[in-house]
A protein has these predicted regions:
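A short, N-terminal "cap"/entry segment at the start of jelly-roll beta-barrel domains
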Residues: 1-46, 133-159
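Conserved short histidine dyad/triad with adjacent acidic residue
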Residues: 31-36, 50-66, 101
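Short, conserved beta-strand element in jelly-roll/cupin
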Residues: 46-47, 51-55, 65-84, 120-124
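Short beta-strand segments
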Residues: 61, 87-89, 129
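Ligand-binding loop in jelly-roll beta-barrel domains
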Residues: 81, 101-127
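Short acidic-glycine-tyrosine-enriched beta hairpin
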Residues: 86-102
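A short beta-to-alpha transition loop/helix N-cap that caps and shapes the active-site region
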Residues: 125-130, 140
């Protein structure tokens, strides 16, 4: 059995160049031995678990959908809004929800405290993401290549 205590995991933070998108995460699966770049399913694990945190007033990522990946969310603390294809839905501690492939989504912390939640993804090989607001695609590769009609920066057209 492999075991970690999530209280001991380092939190990785990220921010877009202009600060519209800010977040942090504890990579639980990687701490348990997951190797994200491997194509060996024993090394990749069949799912990926992260504890994510979005500061008050921020968005974690641009509005996007996955080509193959399912994502399950469980809110631990805080409040927010999930933007999705049918509009937006408020979320709070205890809420759980799921997005299947091709369902665009985005989480925003509209509360006064951090929005903290678990994300569990099924981790498919060959995944890509579509960003409807900026009409671009992310093709999963070591280079995190974005496609429109030319190479682009990840946050191009988002801020």
């Amino acid at each position: 059995m492999q075991k970690v205590n999530t209280n001991d995991l380092a939190e990785l933070t990220w921010s877009s160049p202009k600060g519209k998108f800010v977040g942090a995460g504890k990579q639980v699966s990687e701490a348990l031995g997951r190797k994200p770049a491997s194509t060996d399913l024993n090394e990749r694990h069949p799912f990926d678990v992260e504890i994510s945190r979005i500061p008050a007033g921020k968005l974690a990522f641009p509005y996007h959908s996955h080509s193959a990946q399912w994502e399950f969310y469980h809110v631990i603390s805080g409040t927010g809004i999930v933007r999705h294809k049918d509009g937006s839905t408020p979320i709070e501690a205890g809420d759980a929800f799921i997005f299947k492939p091709d369902e665009p989504h985005q989480l925003e912390n509209n509360g006064a405290e951090d929005l903290v939640f678990y994300v569990v993804a099924d981790n498919p090989i060959g995944e890509s993401c579509h960003y409807p607001d900026s009409n671009k695609w992310l093709v999963r590769s070591p280079e995190r290549r974005l496609l429109r009609s030319e190479n682009l920066d990840y946050f191009d057209g988002e801020e």
